[in-house]
Amino acid sequence: MSPEATTRSGVVFRVLDAMDAPHSGRILRLRLQSGEAPSIKSLKGSTLKAVSPDGDECRGKVLGFAAFGGKPSNERLARTGRIDVHVEELDDTGPVGLRWEVHPS
C-alpha cells in the first residue's frame, strides 16, 4: 500500500497540545488515535482536516515537524504514536486547540 493510501485510510490523530509557532503557523502535538501510523514523508506537505469537539472544521497544511520532542522518524511515530507538526491554517475557522481530531487527507 502506498504511503498516500495509508494516510487516507482511517487515520485519526488527537491534539494533545497546540501553540503558536515562533514566526507563523501553529505547532500541534498529535497522538495517533486510530489507524496505522502514516510515514513522515506522506505527512509533510499534506493537508489536514481538524474537527473540534463542537463540530467546527479547520484545514491546515503541514509545513514541517517540530524537533523539540526529538527527531521525527517513521519508527518513532509507529512506536510512540506521537508527532509534533508545524501547520499553516488554510482558513479562518481556527485556531486548532486541545481535543480536536485531526484527519490527514
Predicted ranges, named:
Residues S2-S105:
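C-terminal effector/interaction modules appended to NTPase cores
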